[in-house]
């Protein structure tokens, strides 16, 4: 029941603000946006299955954000990271890589749903799957040749190739950003002290906590940023993450978290807050070029 246009605008606004803050305050190459897994929990579990309003769900996200701020100030989140064994920290980065790969294969329909085996190989001879394979080959060649911006070039080339394939659908170039007013500061405090609210907040807290920790450890490991088993300026990164979640709820979006696609920037050499800062600015630009960016097929980014 949420306004789609308002959701688009608020997602871009909060992602841009949080990512820029990560670059300026934490000085780390991590980008933030509403997490897809938590988005699914917000929409399907809380609203559709449990039957609560989206205003109720936003209230739960807001409370979760406040708790995260408290846990960050008291260094609880840092202590959790410290007690994770070194071998597990390294394996987390591997797991995140596999997770990203699976998302990409699924988006490109190379891996599809199967009732008997859960997943199976899709039709690789046409459509998004074939386009994705072409994109993988193009991007791989560029990466091997160490071409600057290899992944970006690969996405652009794959998008253009997708036009004759009928996969890329051009939607225009520029549009005026929709207003965020329909979902701004829309909370429901009537059931704040109910057992259901406690369960939902705890679930959001638990998933977001380990999602963020796993992403930070995995991407930082890939970037070679971990010194003596510790991530530099970790507390600042956690604080940005907590503030983003709280602010995101106020603006009308689900839990904002550091997302695994940050690995793409690291892979291209990003090691400082400048990476996050530029990414945040690109988020703002995309607000006005939404039709153009929405023309990029998932097979090209997969």
Per-segment meaning from a language model:
Residues 1-6, 119-121, 152-235:
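Helix-loop-helix hairpins and the membrane-proximal interhelical loops
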Residues 1-3, 44-57, 78-91, 98-141, ...:
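Inter-helical loop and helix-membrane interface segments of multi-pass membrane transporters/permeases
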Residues 1-7, 25-31, 118-128, 265-275, ...:
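Short, amphipathic, aromatic/basic-enriched membrane-interface segments that mark the entry/exit
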Residues 5-9, 51-55, 59, 85, ...:
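Structural motif marking the loop-to-transmembrane transition
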Residues 14-23, 44, 62-72, 93-108, ...:
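Hydrophobic core segments of alpha-helical transmembrane domains in multi-pass membrane transport
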Residues 14-15, 24, 35-93, 219-302:
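Helix-loop-helix junctions within the multi-pass membrane cores of secondary transporters/permeases
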Residues 20-34, 141-152, 267-273:
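Membrane-helix interface "capping/anchor" motifs
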Residues 27-31, 76-77, 111-115, 144, ...:
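Transmembrane helix-loop junctions in multipass membrane proteins, especially transporters and channels
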